[in-house]
Amino acid sequence: MSVIKMTDLDLAGKRVFIRADLNVPVKEGKVTSDARIRASLPTIELALKQGAKVMVTSHLGRPTEGEYNEEFSLLPVVNYLKDKLSNPVRLVKDYLDGVDVAEGELVVLENVRFNKGEKKDDEALSKKYAALCDVFVMDAFGTAHRAQASTHGIGKFADVACAGPLLAAELDALGKALKEPARPMVAIVGGSKVSTKLTVLDSLSKIADQLIVGGGIANTFVAAQGHSVGKSLYEADLVDEAKRLLTTCDIPVPTDVRVATEFSETAPATLKSVNDVKEDEQILDIGDASAQQLAEILKNAKTILWNGPVGVFEFPNFRKGTEIVANAIADSEAFSIAGGGDTLAAIDLFGIADKISYISTGGGAFLEFVEGKVLPAVAMLEERAKK
């Protein structure tokens, strides 16, 4: 994948526009989870260190486009950055007709979604963004699958368009896992619905030596083997699709499960064979034997791609399956890449972040890359690298 990298450029004295992913949860004016800002800090610090005139921006939440709304302001992010950086940091609300930035100063441009035409990749808006800078740095992998003015359009018109360190690392890690993986390659796809992950399952069934399914997805595969799943979340209309995948790829289906009669944090868990699920029960986790089988598979893997838990790990009684799988990935010597919101929450819960080779910051973008789709922002950077 050939793109210009920010790390290959001399940014001294240049006006640098960084599109980061600073879309963080905010409560009462305070950032409540700083993972995305922390991930973006090295890019910002590198540009400042090089003596660039640095602007950074992002979307935050889902405001009505074209309207300022204090609730979605980047002010909490600015306050966070002021605490972390020794450089002066200021928020600029109106910047489309130009902004003065001093060397060594960080200017945060207010939420891009306050600008009319952002989501539609409006050409006039894209040109206004591009006029603000000498170098455009796309560093928001999480929005690379969307063709929007601040992620895609600006890059077509800026003098130079490049990939920031975070985006470059993400593309390298995903390329390593998907293009020429060390084998055996094991892919774990969890989550509630087969329908939302069908193309992912299909793509991975062609790449992975072993495909592991978990959560509600696994229930559809259990049903495909002719077992009753009781009141479990599953998709009856996709049972035939699950049967097809079982014939094309090695997919271990749970042999034992943890069930409950209600979907509740306090519901007691009953461990039983997959043959014995009653009509009033729902499967909320895989059983110990199934979890150990998966742990063995993961122990021998050379590449692991992990997207989604294998049970309702948010409920302590139904956490064990995901915990065993998570620890097996952490203990494995394989190159491991993990992505998706639930997966990141599980990694935090079990404290294994430092044992995963690469943690992807992109949710939808991560899945679309895995599906083999072209990400508009990446395609734009590749195109600009040719000029």
Curated annotation (Swiss-Prot):
Pfam families: PGK (PF00162). Substrate binds at residues 21-23, 36, 59-62, 113, 146. The keyword Cytoplasm applies. InterPro entries: Phosphoglycerate_kinase, Phosphoglycerate_kinase_CS, Phosphoglycerate_kinase_N, Phosphoglycerate_kinase_sf. ATP binds at residues 197, 314, 340-343. It is an enzyme of class 2 (transferase). GO terms for biological process: gluconeogenesis; glycolytic process. It is found in: Cytoplasm. Pathway: Carbohydrate degradation; glycolysis; pyruvate from D-glyceraldehyde 3-phosphate: step 2/5. It catalyses: (2R)-3-phosphoglycerate + ATP = (2R)-3-phospho-glyceroyl phosphate + ADP. Keywords: ATP-binding, Cytoplasm, Glycolysis, Kinase, Nucleotide-binding, Transferase. One of its GO terms (cellular component) is cytosol. Its EC number is 2.7.2.3. It comes from the Bacteria. GO terms for molecular function: ADP binding; ATP binding; phosphoglycerate kinase activity. HAMAP family: Phosphoglyc_kinase. PANTHER family: PHOSPHOGLYCERATE KINASE (PTHR11406), PHOSPHOGLYCERATE KINASE 1, CHLOROPLASTIC-RELATED (PTHR11406:SF23). Belongs to the phosphoglycerate kinase family. Monomer. This is Phosphoglycerate kinase. It comes from Salmonella typhimurium (strain LT2 / SGSC1412 / ATCC 700720).
